[in-house]
Amino acid sequence: MDAQAQTAIKHYAEMQSAPRFPLHLPVEMKSQSGTCSAETQNISANGVLFAMDRDVPVGSLVEFTILLPGDVVGSRRDVQIDCHGRVVRSFEDQGRRGVGVVIDEYHFERV
């Protein structure tokens, strides 16, 4: 196994250690191959697991916006999180794709 693969595995293991919160929200994900609909399955400080109908290859750069309802974040207004990240995991489960994304950059905005 080369050094790059070992680094990726170590980073993924660290990402997995962050607490995950089950949250199912609709999202539009943009990648080089186009835009597709997805649904968050869980969210952590490091990333998001999405359920979707198509594959997004590991290593793909993606952009997506998560709209958190105000009651979830203890606010009167919803909070929008604009995210840039990369796919670190892709698998199939019961006919749907699971896609794990590490968030590299994000921006919060009240809407």
Range-by-range predicted roles:
Residues 1-111:
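Structured alpha-helical
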